Curated annotation (Swiss-Prot):
Region (Disordered): 1-22, 103-336
Pfam families from the UniProt entry: CSD (PF00313)
Ribonucleoprotein listed as a keyword: yes
UniProt feature, compositional bias: Basic residues: 123-134, 168-186, 225-238, 269-281
Function per UniProt: Has a dual function in oocytes: as a DNA-binding protein, binds to the Y-box sequence (CTGATTGGCCAA) in the promoters of target genes to stimulate transcription. May also function at CCAAT-containing promoters that lack the consensus Y-box sequence. Also binds mRNA to promote accumulation of the transcripts it contributes to produce.
Species name: Xenopus laevis
Alphabetized GO MF terms: nucleic acid binding; RNA binding; sequence-specific DNA binding
Compositionally skewed regions (Low complexity) per UniProt: 282-292
Posttranslational modification: Phosphorylation activates in vitro RNA binding.
Bias type Basic and acidic residues, positions: 252-268
Keywords: Cytoplasm, DNA-binding, Phosphoprotein, Ribonucleoprotein, RNA-binding, Transcription, Transcription regulation
Protein name, as recorded: Y-box-binding protein 2-A
Entry superkingdom: Eukaryota
Length: 336
């Protein structure tokens, strides 16, 4: 017996099952279903209900007892409200169950099983309209890059013939918050397809020059649409003022321009003080006036007492003779 017992296989331990993740609403409903029911279809008046915290109290009409109510206990909520809630002073119908700390409400509805009105502080659901977006047409089966709507595709599947001069479908602009400034969208595919068609036509048929009427009307299929350029802003041309010629010398003569290329003058300092320039200009004018007076005054030589002419030449190079005294005047004695 001992050998038989030793040969028996040992039991393999089974792995423990992982706990299921449950939503709070489903878990609360299951807990309420497992709780003991004290009364059913009891009517009462909502004493107060906090929408943010999600709980409140209901005063029973029969026993005047306050019953705790949670937002998960509301069975039929207002379809226009985003959150489950009951309004203050609203008459509701509910079941009373035994909770951990006392009586609790369950399966809360309006009187007669209608949805509750809800609290005025509860947010309403967002009103939106359902928009039916057209699916983008497949570009592989298109000819000439023309977009076809689903309605036109259904008609084309029946007849498989559409008008050749059908305008391409325009894409709807994006919403305002998706738009970007200075953003250029992708080029339409009809240009590439048109270029392929033009090459095929040129191979099959003889090239024919477009007439002047076609060019004037703008129906040339080979000519792509003109591109729109935005002209850049350029600063207007403002010529610089000519440099003023500075006078040299006190006689007001300006410097004559030589035939040779003059050397460029060094750039002046723009931040020189104004007083310093006035002082330099005053000193230059004083020196120029002194030089001019020295040139204008001739040299004067005194006449000799004997009346002989002076041999010293003047600036002009001609000798200057002194006038002889009058004999009558010289012989007369001076009065005493």
């Amino acid at each position: 017996m001992s050998e038989a017992e030793a040969q028996e296989p040992e039991p393999v331990p089974q792995p423990e099952s992982e706990p299921e993740i449950q939503k709070p609403g489903i878990a609360a409903a299951r807990n309420q279903a497992n709780k003991k029911v004290l009364a059913t279809q009891v009517q009462g008046t909502v004493k107060w209900f906090n929408v943010r915290n999600g709980y409140g109290f209901i005063n029973r009409n029969d026993t005047k007892e306050d019953v705790f109510v949670h937002q998960t206990a509301i069975k039929k909520n207002n379809p226009r409200k985003f959150l489950r809630s009951v309004g203050d002073g609203e008459t509701v119908e509910f079941d009373v169950v035994e909770g951990e700390k006392g009586a609790e409400a369950a399966n809360v509805t309006g009187p007669g099983g209608v949805p509750v009105k809800g609290s005025r502080f509860a947010p309403n659901r967002r009103r939106f309209r359902r928009r039916f977006y057209r699916p983008r047409a497949d570009t592989a089966g298109e000819s000439g890059g023309e977009g076809v709507s689903p309605e036109q595709m259904s008609e084309g599947e029946r007849g498989e013939e559409t008008s050749p001069q059908q305008r391409p479908q325009r894409r709807r602009p994006p919403p305002f918050f998706y738009r970007r400034r200075f953003r250029r969208g992708p080029r339409p595919n009809n240009q590439q397809n048109q270029g392929a068609e033009v090459t095929e036509q040129s191979e099959n048929k003889d090239p024919v020059a477009p007439t002047s009427e076609a060019l004037a009307s703008g129906d040339d299929p080979q000519r792509p649409p003109p591109r729109r350029f935005r002209q850049r802003f350029r600063r207007p041309f403002r010529p610089r003022p000519a440099p003023q010629q500075t006078p040299e010398g006190g006689d007001g003569e300006t410097k004559a321009e030589s035939g040779e290329d003059p050397r460029p003058e060094p750039q002046r300092q723009r931040n020189r003080p104004y007083v310093q320039r006035r002082r330099r200009q005053g000193a230059t004018q004083v020196a120029a006036t002194a030089q001019g007076e020295g040139k204008a005054e001739p040299t004067q030589h005194p006449a000799s007492e004997e009346g002989t002419p002076s041999d010293s030449p003047t600036d002009d190079g001609a000798p200057v003779q002194s006038s002889a005294p009058d004999p009558g005047i010289a012989d007369t004695p001076a009065p005493e």
